[in-house]
Structure formats: structure tokens, C-alpha cells
């Protein structure tokens, strides 16, 4: 069963990822991932620090976006934070759920993206 979360309830790594990405601070974002982390984005999977650092560095400056928090949930060890993204990317507006799993030390172990629930 999902537990609903407020923005203030989100773990530090989730806030760090969103704030770091919005601030285009690649080093901050990279430091949030565990050594064996896995990110899946747009059909591509990135494993480990080297691949994830490449994903961050290639993506962090691609588009200018503004995020609006829509809601969050926790379910079976996954923290899903939903945002409305508006920016200069194709389509201009999208609602996404950032799906985080954290390790015991609070670092990001996995990150996936899905369409946010309506």
C-alpha cells in the first residue's frame, strides 16, 4: 500500500537530486549515487558511477526546465516524487514520477522515470 508523502518528507538524496539538477550542479548530483547504482532513462540503462556520471554530464545542460512538485509516495522501498516539468524540450510540458530506491546509507541505488499518475 502506498504511503503519501509531502515534499518536506522526501529523503535528502531526492531533494539533492532535484535541486542539483535544477541548479545544473553535476558534481552534486553525481555524489548522490551509490557506486553500483543503476539509472534507467528513455530506454537506456546506465550502471555504475562512470556511466551515470556520463548521463548526468550529458543531460544536465540539455534543456532549461522548471519543476513543480505534484506529490510523492512511498511503496515497497521506492520513493516516487512527481513533478510537472516545463521547459524548452520537445513538447514543452510533461508530468513525470522520479522513482528512487536508496541504499542503507541514503545514496541513490536506482532511479527510474515514469509518467506521473493523473
Give, region by region, the residue ranges found by the protein language model.
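A broad detector of the eukaryotic-type serine/threonine protein kinase catalytic domain
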Residues: 37-38, 116
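Short, low-complexity N-terminal intrinsically disordered segments enriched in polar/charged residues
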Residues: 1-27, 31
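Short, hydrophobic secondary-structure boundary micro-motifs
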Residues: 30, 40-41, 68, 111
Amino acid at each position: 500500500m502506498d504511503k503519501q508523502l509531502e515534499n518536506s518528507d522526501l529523503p535528502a538524496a531526492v531533494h539533492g537530486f532535484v535541486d542539483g539538477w535544477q541548479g545544473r550542479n553535476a558534481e552534486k548530483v553525481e555524489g548522490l549515487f551509490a557506486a553500483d547504482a543503476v539509472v534507467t532513462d528513455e530506454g537506456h540503462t546506465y550502471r555504475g558511477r562512470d556511466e551515470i556520471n556520463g548521463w548526468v554530464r550529458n543531460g544536465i545542460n540539455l534543456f532549461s526546465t522548471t519543476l513543480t512538485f505534484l506529490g510523492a509516495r512511498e511503496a515497497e522501498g521506492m520513493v516516487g516524487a512527481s513533478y510537472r516539468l516545463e521547459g524548452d524540450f520537445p513538447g514543452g510540458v510533461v508530468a513525470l514520477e522520479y522513482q528512487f530506491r536508496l541504499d542503507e546509507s541514503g545514496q541513490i541505488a536506482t532511479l527510474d522515470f515514469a509518467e506521473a499518475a493523473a
